[in-house]
């Protein structure tokens, strides 16, 4: 079972969505308050059923938000981000060497986010 791990950082508070094996699937931005951080978690739960826009394919179809976007970063790695209905990025992934692994990350968000418990980081 996955979990949202809430963590205080120097500039505020953020969360990671972790898979059952403890691996980080996606990371949020830094929020100024715990309330806004928890709202971000609810937004991931609500929007994780979104479709996938694969921006690595030439002539890709632009989808409406909410959506997952797959893209290639400056280092040439595949990444995904989940955008809310308002276009804000809610969570983003680490870099993946293969697009198939990136897609598995998205599937893991879809599987884990709806039922994931919210816990405070140690």
Regions found by a protein language model. Name each.
Residues 1-10, 46-74, 116-122:
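Intrinsic disorder/low-complexity detector
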Residues 3-31, 40-44, 67-97, 101-109:
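A structural feature that tracks compact, well-ordered secondary-structure segments
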Residues 33-36, 55-59, 98-101:
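Short amphipathic alpha-helical linker/capping segments at the junctions of internal repeats
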């Amino acid at each position: 079972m996955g979990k949202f791990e809430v963590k205080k950082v120097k500039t505020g508070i953020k969360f990671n969505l972790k898979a059952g094996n403890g691996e980080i699937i996606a990371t949020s931005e830094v929020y100024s308050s715990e309330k806004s951080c928890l709202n971000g978690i609810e937004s991931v739960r609500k929007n994780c059923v979104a479709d996938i826009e694969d921006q690595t394919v030439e002539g890709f179809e632009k989808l409406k938000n909410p959506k997952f976007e797959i893209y290639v970063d400056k280092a040439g790695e595949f990444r995904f981000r989940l955008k809310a209905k308002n276009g804000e990025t809610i969570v983003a992934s680490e870099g993946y060497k293969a697009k198939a692994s990136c897609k598995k990350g998205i599937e893991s968000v879809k599987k884990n986010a709806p039922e994931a418990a919210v816990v405070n980081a140690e």
